[in-house]
């Protein structure tokens, strides 16, 4: 777990506090534009093994079920995974970008409610993509793949986050972009705001309370004025 500080008490007053005591954020596809890079790294790795990875297969296996597409190849899985991971970090170093609207949204919400990141991304990859993002100081702690046994769509990541925060899941909001992430948060008892990206459109988001077109809609939904909190 990556921790900046313990959760502070919630800010008194305001519509959002009446609804929620904390906000948990997915990373890839919500904060950072990286899922197309992960697809590229997996496709290139599988091509080395003579397997063609289509976007539809990637969406079904990785983004919806949360399973590894490398299982499509036979042979030395660890060698293929190692090559894929190295290639992915190269792509992250060169091309990972903060999704438009994220910085402004976090500036508005920071200090209003406790916030944390709950991601299936491995810690090394997470830190690589955030080297220059400027986002991490907005969060009280971060859970990466190494911090729990079962990944999304299992509810364990969000249950672990609520336990770490000392918060009732029913009083927390999760912000997700994928079917597996929405499923994980809903199964853990959180309210979910879904912001499907291009690679996740067409998924089952029926358990999300809200379906947003842009992250910039979130502050207004929570009753904030959209101005950075001081």
Regions found by a protein language model. Give the residues of each.
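Short, flexible loop segments at the rims of nucleotide/cofactor-binding pockets, characterized by
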Residues: 91-96, 120, 188-189
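N-terminal helical cap/lid subdomain that shapes the substrate entry/recognition surface
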Residues: 18-107, 111
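Short "lid" loop at the C-terminus of a central beta-strand within the Rossmann-like core
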Residues: 63, 122-123
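Glycine-centered short loops/turns at secondary-structure junctions
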Residues: 112-113, 189
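Conserved phosphate-coupling serine/threonine residues in phosphotransfer and NTP-handling enzymes
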Residues: 30, 119-121
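Asp-based, Mg2+/Mn2+-dependent phosphohydrolase catalytic module
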Residues: 2-20, 103, 107, 123-230
């Amino acid at each position: 777990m990556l921790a900046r500080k313990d959760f502070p008490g919630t800010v008194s007053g305001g519509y959002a506090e009446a609804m929620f005591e904390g906000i948990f954020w997915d990373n890839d596809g919500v904060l950072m534009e990286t899922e197309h890079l992960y697809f590229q790294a997996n496709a290139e790795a599988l091509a080395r093994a003579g397997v063609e990875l289509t976007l539809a297969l990637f969406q079904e296996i990785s983004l919806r079920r949360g399973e590894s597409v490398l299982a499509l190849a036979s042979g030395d899985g660890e060698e293929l995974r190692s090559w894929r991971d190295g290639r992915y970090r190269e792509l992250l170093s060169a091309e990972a970008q903060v999704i438009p609207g994220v910085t402004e949204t976090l500036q508005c919400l920071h200090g209003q409610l406790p916030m944390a990141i709950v991601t299936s991304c491995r810690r090394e990859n997470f830190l690589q993509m955030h080297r220059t993002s400027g986002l991490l100081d907005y969060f009280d702690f971060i859970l990466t793949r190494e911090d729990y046994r079962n990944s999304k769509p299992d509810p364990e990541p969000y249950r672990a986050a609520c336990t770490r925060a000392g918060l009732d899941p029913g009083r927390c909001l999760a912000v997700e972009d994928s079917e597996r992430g929405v499923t994980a948060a809903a199964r853990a008892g959180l309210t979910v705001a879904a912001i499907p990206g291009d690679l996740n459109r067409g998924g089952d988001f029926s358990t999300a309370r809200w379906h947003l077109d842009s992250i910039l809609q979130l502050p207004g939904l929570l009753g904030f004025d959209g101005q950075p909190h001081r």
